[in-house]
Amino acid sequence: MIKPQTYLKIADNTGAQKIMCIRILGPNCQYANIGDIIIAVVKEAIPNMVVKKSDIVKAVIVRTVKGVRRESGMAIRFDENAAVIINNDRSPKGTRIFGPIARELREKEFVKIMSLAPEVV
């Protein structure tokens, strides 16, 4: 569960390292789960990269500590909250994705992120 003011790690190579959620997109949303789009501000960034500190970005959540329950009854949880920065057309801004990605992103039509990920859980 990601709420506003939550810090997330970035799982791509855009240059941002940490972001803070400021808004969850969608009708009447109070918290976000895997596959939801958020608006965030960059809190830590590597210098001279695509994304700078204090930039406002859109991101899709790819890992949460709370996890997600599948129809088979299995629950998937991760060690950290992580997101991938995306463009307005829902394609990733970076060219590489780091760490495992949940399979639920395919249902939300983030196929490009799935293809860049090294491991799909």
Swiss-Prot record:
GO terms for molecular function: large ribosomal subunit rRNA binding; structural constituent of ribosome. GO terms for biological process: translation. Keywords: Chloroplast, Plastid, Ribonucleoprotein, Ribosomal protein, RNA-binding, rRNA-binding. It comes from the Eukaryota. It is found in: Plastid, Chloroplast. Disulfide bonds: none annotated. SUPFAM superfamilies: Ribosomal protein L14 (SSF50193). GO terms for cellular component: chloroplast; cytosolic large ribosomal subunit. InterPro entries: Ribosomal_uL14, Ribosomal_uL14_bac-type, Ribosomal_uL14_CS, Ribosomal_uL14_sf. CDD domains: Ribosomal_uL14. Belongs to the universal ribosomal protein uL14 family. Binds to 23S rRNA. PANTHER family: 50S/60S RIBOSOMAL PROTEIN L14/L23, LARGE RIBOSOMAL SUBUNIT PROTEIN UL14M. This is Large ribosomal subunit protein uL14c. It comes from Euglena gracilis. The lineage of its organism: Eukaryota, Discoba, Euglenozoa, Euglenida, Spirocuta. The gene is rpl14.
